[in-house]
């Protein structure tokens, strides 16, 4: 092996193919005036004699052609004491060589005559062995002799060479922190850079953060909000995701390829775990037994285990992708419609969960439907008059009727479990949360039913029919809307009205507390001087603030604004509520100050039905139209028509909403892609 091959291998890490001595003879006709063909054998030997001492001086541990050294090596600390963080001249360069570039360089070198190869190798050897100061001098001399085309070539080459893969060089937790600042478009582009970037950019740590930032809320940076994800999964995965951010192995496989992340989420349901990457969660003995049975049944076959977890769980990037499609469909009104027909009179109330839809009608029946097939599963008979309100969960359905009664049903079997009477007029509104049931009646009262201690109480104060109620068990308060054009906030502990909201000039039909995640910016508020609420005449009720803007109230002080009973750390009621009335308007209120922040205009007649979450408000009115609103800007984003009668009830979900009408039909609009 000659000196050319030795130099190329030691400098660039390549392995040049053997050179044929016969084919390597120089061809004077193929080279320009800058060729090394004029170098004689004597000159080559002289160059060797000049280069060898230089190499032996600066890299004695790699090059010692003059004989092995027996003495103490020279102290190189003085020559190489100043170095940048990316390169140390006294050590081997830590930057990895680019294989395609090195292959091309090798091929180009082999096209030259042997003497030219030897001369170039000498230059490379000198530069490789030189200390930092010498290298700068060599580079300055070379640059001074370069013409403009050569300088342009150097500039283009250096632009790529000085780039470093900082995400791979940094610890994973810092890389995740950086990626969490990117938007979705930038993340997708980052995933195309390399395999390691894809492993980082597609990891659950990054996309879980993206889901938290956008799902069920408006992102302050981009203004986008995505439909609500199942909160249980979001909550249960958060701690495990945070742990993954600190234990991520960059050399491991991409989470988009394997199901490791999904396995950890499933196995995290067990109270004990042998892996430090899996979170612990308290579960009941029965739940633990179920999990153990599942794990034991899957343990013998790892392939089945992977298939099971892949089937049950998806990476957070896939979740975001699905929610993004749904959000886009909401934005542009792309949806499918399904119509449910079966009632013989107007549909007055409805609710849907998963694939179950329950509807109540003036024909005194409740119907249970399968939303996937449109099939009527069963009809519940028992009320003697029209059904005005209903609500169901996994185990029961409670309905209220104009026959003055409340009934509790097993909606899966159609059996009526119990009947409650207590109102002197028809029941036209109800809402239950945990063990508290509130009912609204024609008799102008709100009745509270406590299933835990079997107690009841009446809340009096409205002067006309009470149309709707909402229970908030966190703050132990109840909202009520009435035909007396007011909305009241009641304290369940003191049984007193602590706030009355005035502003509507028509009968208030609906009141809905917005989720606590909802945020309203101060600059979005409208200054409406005539819409300041007042408080009731009950003693101890605090006076509301009448400032013409959204006050910046600290969370700790919000509770105290509702009276002395909230001073001891008791949670405050929901900060924002939405109401609708027969004055054809919808209003957004702040409960802490009692101010109307925004009024929504657009319906031609009274608004009977209302649905709301953190992203949108859906309303149905006497004008037979359904409108979707942005709660922050007040803009009507879309209007749906189709009903031939007034829209009387609305149910709102993450990717669909349902409307009921006096035309005896229920329409479900699905935005799921």
Curated annotation (Swiss-Prot):
Extent of the WD repeats: 342-379, 382-421, 423-459, 461-502, 556-599, 602-639, 642-673
GO biological process: protein ubiquitination
Pathway(s) this gene product operates in, as recorded in its UniProt entry: Protein modification; protein ubiquitination
Ranges of compositional bias, category Polar residues: 253-276
Keywords: Repeat, Transcription, Transcription regulation, Ubl conjugation pathway, WD repeat
Boundaries of every F-box domain copy: 164-210
Chain positions covered by the region annotation Disordered: 1-37, 249-302
Record note on quaternary structure: Component of the SCF(sconB) E3 ubiquitin ligase complex.
Family per similarity comment: Belongs to the WD repeat MET30/SCONB/SCON-2 family.
Function: Component of the SCF(sconB) E3 ubiquitin ligase complex involved in the regulation of sulfur metabolite repression, probably by mediating the inactivation or degradation of the metR transcription factor.
Name used for this protein in its record: Probable E3 ubiquitin ligase complex SCF subunit sconB
Organism field: Aspergillus terreus (strain NIH 2624 / FGSC A1156)
